[in-house]
Amino acid sequence: MKHGIKKNKLSRCTEHRLSMLKNLSISLINHEQIVTTLPKAKALRPYVEKFITIAKNNDSLHGRRLLLSRLHNSKLVVDKLLSVLANRYQDRKGGYSRIIKFGTRKGDCAPMAVIELVDRDISAKGEIYSKNKKGSKVVTQS
């Protein structure tokens, strides 16, 4: 019986849904703003906010390994979470993301939404946190 389970299944099996949420969260953390459907954005919001809370509270090796295990071993995204986003949201208790309704998609009239991180640098649109060949972290323009 499924008493008290209120998560949206998004018409997908468990593995597909979790993989999709991980990929969407990696894109959101990397770009700090993405356009997706409204149900996906609503399912993604608590998922990403838990990652930011883990990064804020666990700046140790344990926190890094916990985030790596939940984000497809994406080291650049975990580095950005621990260095940039954890410092940005140090004083904020929660509510790290916002959902803005964006109209409907032309093909199937699906409701679209923009999900973005609060207090993001708007002038850094299109920049991606990455590493150069020497191993130092840089922000590149995409």
From Swiss-Prot:
Cited PANTHER family: LARGE RIBOSOMAL SUBUNIT PROTEIN BL17M, RIBOSOMAL PROTEIN L17
Protein family per UniProt: Belongs to the bacterial ribosomal protein bL17 family.
One GO term (biological process): translation
One protein family per Pfam: Ribosomal_L17
Record organism: Wolbachia pipientis subsp. Culex pipiens (strain wPip)
Gene Ontology MF term list: structural constituent of ribosome
UniProtKB keywords: Ribonucleoprotein, Ribosomal protein
GO cellular component terms attached to this protein's record: cytosolic large ribosomal subunit
Quaternary assembly: Part of the 50S ribosomal subunit. Contacts protein L32.
The UniProt record lists the keyword Ribosomal protein: yes
Designated name of the protein: Large ribosomal subunit protein bL17
HAMAP family in the record: Ribosomal_bL17
